[in-house]
Amino acid sequence: MYIKTFPKIIRRPAVLEITGWSKSTLYNRIHDGLFPSSINLGARAVGFVEGECNNVIQAMIAGYSEQQLKSLVKDIVTNRSVKG
């Protein structure tokens, strides 16, 4: 039997806790293309795809340069789609 798993969505406080960043640092990194942007969950709610965040954090740990991080984030955001 095949069980379909869905990406886990985490809210901003969880991202801040995981990264240790301030809100302004998080949004500056998103603006600079160094961290994946949030997704809309509703009219007034947004969240972050946990797997995307983890991929970028792992790349930071691995010592990716700023340019490599930008490329990774661009690929992550570009590849967002509904997979059936």
What is each of the regions a protein language model found here?
Residues 54-84:
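A short, Lys/Arg-enriched interface patch at domain edges and termini
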